[in-house]
C-alpha cells in the first residue's frame, strides 16, 4: 500500500510537470528547449518554436540545516543535512523571460544534529535544550521533521539558456511533523528513540530565501522568521538553511 501511494504521488507530479513544459524561443537553438536532465523532453505536446523558454520547475535544495538565536551558527554537527523538493511554475513577466515569477509547492525534510537534550516540559508549556552529559549513553541526537509550504519567488536571469540567475523569494507553510531522535549503540545493537512531545511547537512557518547561480546550479540560503518554539521562555531558535540547488528542468 505504501509503495502504491508513493507511485501515485510520483505519477501525479510528473503529469503536472509534463503539462507545464515550456517551449524554446529562436531558430538558432531548436533542440535546446530546457536545461538539465529533461533537455529533450517537451511534454505531451510538440514544442512551439516561437514561445519563450522557461526554467527551474523541479528544484532540489540539498541543505546544511542549522539554527540561530540562543545558540550560534555552526555549533551543530556537519551531518545536519536536509532536502527541499520544489515543484514550481515559471511565469514570465518579460518577452525574453529575463524576469519571471516562480510559485508552486515545496516539501522540506530537515535534520539538525545538535547532540544534546531537547525536551518539552508539558507542565510549563516550554521546550529546553541542555548539552550532553558524561553519564548520557546516546551516541547522537537530532531534531528532524517535515513541512509543506507555498513558495513565491521573483526570478532574474539572462535570456540565453546559459544564463546567470538570481531568485529572491519566501515561503509560507505548515510544519506537519517534528521530533527529537536519540541514537544509542552501533550496528546490531543500535537503538533509536523518538520523541514528538513539544508543547509549544510552531506549526506555521514563514521564511525568506535566495538562490544565486548559473544555469542548473545555484547556491541556496534560507532563514525562518518565526522561532521553532513559540513560548518566550523556551529556547529561542530560528531555522537557517544553506546549500546547493539543482534544477532538473
Protein language model annotation of sequence segments:
Residues 71-78, 112-145, 175-187, 192-207:
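Extracellular/periplasm-exposed beta-strand and loop segments of Gram-negative cell-envelope proteins
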Residues 54-56, 77-83, 144-148, 202-206, ...:
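Residues that define the transmembrane beta-barrel architecture of outer-membrane proteins
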Residues 67, 195-249:
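Predominantly the C-terminal beta-signal and adjacent terminal strand-loop region
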Residues 85-91, 105-107, 150-156, 168-174, ...:
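Residues on the lipid-exposed face of transmembrane beta-strands in outer-membrane beta-barrel proteins
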Residues 44-56, 92-99, 159-164:
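Short loop/turn motifs that connect adjacent beta-strands in outer-membrane beta-barrel proteins
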Residues 1-47:
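Cleavable N-terminal export/targeting peptides
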